[in-house]
């Protein structure tokens, strides 16, 4: 099916989603499976950049959700000491052999988890981390230990997600658009970006920066307060702002624009990408 045909089929299926079960066959199952496969291969994305704007393919997100209706719970093997898991979503790596790994061209360290319908591009390094379904991780990115890439999140090229970073998903609670980290960003350890916020190209978030839709993002130089988006080339740290009754509340502070000194501290190590 073409993307237009898939979209039409998914939108129709969405209207009768309460009637869809693991026993459902025919066009609904075919359309959902084809969409999940396209997401898994990276030929379709939940969100794609058009110029400077991001366009969300809401129907692709709906297909991810419909996949839960079509699949029954089953045992997943491979747990410690012969243990198992109980889930509906297959591993991206299910039934992979050396040929599939060679073709994929990324590195997956033992104990990383990637669920089917997430796309991982060539040159990516996955430390023991978690990438949820529908996500897109572009070339040359490092997903460091205990980092989480949430459902349908979009991660750009040559991004570094440091240890324990959380990139929010869109499925629960439901969000209109995915969280997006654009190319060449560095996200410091234990930082969180959630609720469909966007970190624009080349930005650096220091350790422990938390950004959601209601988080004030303050430009120290101009005093401007913004929400939901970090401008390109920003260096952001955790801060606070005065509120009512002498109480200070958390905010994220743009302390400067990325310069050569910042780049020297946050540049990726090509030796780790070979």
Swiss-Prot record:
What GO cellular-component annotations does this UniProt entry give? cytoplasm
The pathway this protein participates in, as annotated, is: Amino-acid biosynthesis; L-lysine biosynthesis via DAP pathway; LL-2,6-diaminopimelate from (S)-tetrahydrodipicolinate (succinylase route): step 1/3
Catalytic activity, reaction form: (S)-2,3,4,5-tetrahydrodipicolinate + succinyl-CoA + H2O = (S)-2-succinylamino-6-oxoheptanedioate + CoA
Task: State whether keyword Repeat applies.
Answer: yes
Top-rank taxon = Bacteria
- Name a Pfam family for this protein: Hexapep_2
Q: Where does substrate bind?
A: 107, 144
Alphabetic keyword roster: Acyltransferase, Amino-acid biosynthesis, Cytoplasm, Diaminopimelate biosynthesis, Lysine biosynthesis, Repeat, Transferase
Assembly notes = Homotrimer.
HAMAP family xrefs: DapD
Q: Which family does it belong to?
A: Belongs to the transferase hexapeptide repeat family.
In Swiss-Prot or TrEMBL terms, this protein is called 2,3,4,5-tetrahydropyridine-2,6-dicarboxylate N-succinyltransferase
Species of the source: Paracoccus denitrificans (strain Pd 1222)
